[in-house]
Amino acid sequence: MIKTNIIFGSSTFVTMRESKLLNNDIIEFDTVFSVADLSKLDNYELTLPKDIYNENINCLLSKEIKKLNEAISNNKDIRVWTSHFDIYSYLLLLYLCDYLENRDCNLYVVFSDEYNENCCSPACMRENELEELAKLEHKLSKKEILEYSKKWKEIKDKKFDMAILENKKVKLVSFDYYNEEILNLLKELGEVKIVRLVGLFMNNYFITINTSQ
């Protein structure tokens, strides 16, 4: 059956569009849940913080939700693409499980790290890899949907600077959470370009959480 694919970000969208999965519908969400005020999300609104974007930015999800509702009305199965290491798409999965927990539809999920443990997000996969990953889809049971929905409810109304994934669990932290690790890496490297510092930190951090399971 043709499925409606739910993805995060334009990178995954472009790659999926070039794959054999093109015959399936694609709904792209691009709002960053991990640093947003989630308290207004019942109205399909998100506020991104001034601390990061220099001004408060209000985002509307009504367009994406409308497409999702239309897909469900047309009896299409829903497939969410995510990873246990990608906070952006993982929070989207939690939100959708909460939104759909009382809806009559089949909900599937694929995790990129189940295809390759070093693949931290569907966004880093090629067309043929996405096609292979689709074969690993897992239909969520009602119990699983409720469990994911519960996780969403646990964080939805809490105050936090940003959400991250550690050991495959959502953790709510402050903006200075990584300060000590970044400063230690900077001391080790000495004079270094910011882009290299960020790249090395992200690589080291991914290796750390990937090997601590």
Report each predicted region and the residues it spans.
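Long, hydrophobic/aromatic-enriched structural stretches that serve as scaffold segments
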Residues: 54-93
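A conserved mid-domain beta-alpha-beta active-site/ligand-binding segment of alpha/beta enzyme cores
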Residues: 122-196
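A general structural motif
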Residues: 1-2, 23, 73-77, 104-106
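A generic structural motif
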Residues: 26-35, 105-117, 213
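Long, charge-rich, low-complexity alpha-helical segments
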Residues: 192, 212-213
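Eukaryotic partner-binding/assembly regions in large regulatory complexes
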Residues: 72, 82-140
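A structured, charge-rich N-terminal accessory region that forms the first stable segment of a protein
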Residues: 1-57
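Short helix-coil junctions and helix-kink-helix linkers
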Residues: 196-211
